[in-house]
């Protein structure tokens, strides 16, 4: 099950989130958590991320960000018919243009059953989200990609580095809940 919804948020609310993430005061953390050899990686991977929320608690220095992003859960319910029962994590990811096209390794965000909601902040014509079955979803501003994840299902995914923009911005929600 995969769902793609364009124009997921009303334009005003989307712009508020985008301006918050693109603001120079938004504090990023360097991450190299995808090591060489991870599900076929041939070299170390890195990107910038900001953890907003993890396991039912907001991150202290990200509280204002959490307050801005939290209303998105109402749209998950309204547009996806998805009721969030547990928030595993919410991260904002920034994949930088490194002058070459390269996909990260295939992975599930969590080994157990969960749902992934990838919300795209900007448009990248060269950086789709890829699935092992060969399908891909283009990275388009204000688009939400929603799918089931976990080791129990054949739905591993990967992302590409952008070539046409400075960075690829997305919010990654890992959730448990139910569709109705």
Predicted feature residues:
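Non-heme Fe(II)/2-oxoglutarate
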Residues: 1-83
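Short, Lys/Arg-enriched, disordered terminal segments
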Residues: 1-3, 12, 122, 177-180
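Short, catalytically relevant binding-site loops at active-site mouths
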Residues: 33-37, 94-99
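A structural signal for well-ordered alpha-helical segments within the folded catalytic domains
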Residues: 67-70, 115, 140
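A short glycine-rich, His/Asp/Glu-containing loop-to-beta-strand
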Residues: 78-98
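Catalytic core of Fe(II)/2-oxoglutarate
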Residues: 90-92, 105, 111-112, 123-180
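Charged, often glycine-rich, active-site loop that binds/positions anionic groups
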Residues: 98-107
